[in-house]
Regions:
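N-terminal [4Fe-4S]-dependent radical SAM core
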Residues: 1-89
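Short, solvent-exposed loop/turn segments at secondary-structure boundaries
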Residues: 42, 62-63, 102-103, 162-163
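Residues that scaffold the ATP/ADP-binding catalytic core of kinase and kinase-like folds
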Residues: 51, 159-163
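Conserved SAM/AdoMet-binding glycine-rich loop
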Residues: 82-160
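Conserved small/polar residues in nucleotide/adenosyl-binding loops
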Residues: 164-168
Length: 168
């Protein structure tokens, strides 16, 4: 038996959540209407060649809907397809979900965390869209709630990154 209480040689994410939260945890994607510096003209326009959010965004994720409504529809959506979850992680997935002023992030993340059954948040973003102030805020949330930050690092080679941009 390994230190994480399993006979597997790896500590699975789902196993970690079951041990931490006492049951199945489901990620619920939301679209908060964020953009990206490679889409809005700050760095580039049109986005990167690999970034096709339509390919993975569930139909209920519409930025015009409130975060709460998207969570409710996401719970219903996943409830029809999978075993019932005991807790939820709200997944800010589309584009760069820290690419906004801190007050906007506080409002959006706060709405998600206030929803019943939400154990935490998962935030997809770019390393260049996170500063010390935002990290301090996420650390503040993480004192009481689960927080994961997914940094989209498509390559560590600058030449390759230049090829990824659709306007390069």
């Amino acid at each position: 038996m390994y230190a994480w209480g399993d006979h597997r040689r790896f500590n699975s994410y789902s196993g970690y959540f079951r041990r931490t939260f006492g049951g199945r945890v489901q990620k619920i994607s939301v679209d908060a209407g964020f953009s990206c510096p490679n889409r809005d003209g700050k760095i580039g326009e049109g986005g990167c060649t690999f970034c096709n959010n339509g390919a993975f965004t569930p139909s209920y994720c519409i930025p015009a809907k409130s975060i709460g409504r998207q969570i409710a529809e996401g719970i219903e959506f996943h409830g029809r397809r999978y075993r019932a979850a005991s807790r939820y992680l709200v997944y800010f997935q589309s584009f760069s979900n820290t690419y906004a002023p801190l007050e906007r992030l506080r409002a959006l993340y706060g709405e998600a965390l206030a929803y019943p059954g939400v154990a935490g948040i998962v935030i997809g973003t770019r390393p260049d869209c996170v500063d010390a102030e935002k990290l301090d805020y996420l650390a503040e949330i993480a004192r009481d709630r689960y927080v994961a930050v997914e940094f989209g690092i498509e390559s560590t080679c600058d030449e390759t990154c230049l090829l990824y941009t659709s306007d390069a």
